[in-house]
């Protein structure tokens, strides 16, 4: 029996794939659990429209991420943290610090998008990766200075 998958099924296929399976597997497992639909013309067209909508949404998100990456490229943000003798920080720079510094410049990103190459635990200038989309990443520089007492 031919079915069109409504969800990814391990070992069988991904959303939108039309696969041929045994009748019992389709009728007793895939269809009742909402994993597949019979491969009628109407069901296939419906799934194809959903796939097209998802693809357009992904393209919009990628385009938006690329525009934001252009804004961020080459940017240097300053962060002041309490530091001891020799420039060692009390603690470290966190993704939340980066997000707050960017928010002050009018750029909104989430903490999960900030990727450190290594922990920042001292005063200086360090590169930090901002992952805006699975295909769009940009490096910014973080200038860590000791907080004035």
From Swiss-Prot:
- Tell me the GO molecular function terms: rRNA binding; structural constituent of ribosome
Keyword rRNA-binding belongs to the record:
yes
* Keywords associated with the record: Ribonucleoprotein, Ribosomal protein, RNA-binding, rRNA-binding
What PROSITE patterns does the entry give? RIBOSOMAL_L9
Annotated Gene Ontology cellular component terms: cytosolic large ribosomal subunit
GO terms for biological process, alphabetical: translation
- Which domain of life does the protein's organism represent? Bacteria
Matching Pfam families: Ribosomal_L9_C, Ribosomal_L9_N
Describe its function: Binds to the 23S rRNA.
Family annotation (HAMAP family): Ribosomal_bL9 (MF_00503)
UniProt record similarity statement: Belongs to the bacterial ribosomal protein bL9 family.
Looking up NCBIfam families in the UniProt record yields: L9
Q: What is this protein called?
A: Large ribosomal subunit protein bL9
List the source organism.
Aquifex aeolicus (strain VF5)
């Amino acid at each position: 029996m031919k079915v069109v998958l409504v969800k990814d099924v391990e070992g069988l296929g991904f959303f939108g794939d039309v696969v041929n399976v045994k009748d019992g597997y389709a009728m007793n497992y895939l269809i009742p659990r909402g994993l597949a639909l019979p491969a009628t013309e109407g069901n296939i067209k419906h799934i194809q429209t959903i796939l097209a909508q998802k693809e357009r949404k992904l393209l919009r998100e990628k385009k938006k991420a690329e525009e934001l990456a252009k804004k961020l490229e080459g940017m240097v943000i300053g962060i002041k943290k309490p530091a001891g003798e020799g420039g060692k920080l009390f603690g470290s720079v966190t993704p939340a610090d980066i997000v707050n510094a960017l928010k002050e410049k009018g750029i909104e990103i989430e903490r999960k998008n900030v990727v450190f190459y290594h922990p920042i635990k001292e005063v200086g200038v360090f590169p930090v990766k901002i992952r805006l989309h699975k295909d769009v990443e940009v490096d910014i520089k973080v200038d860590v200075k000791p907080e004035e007492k």
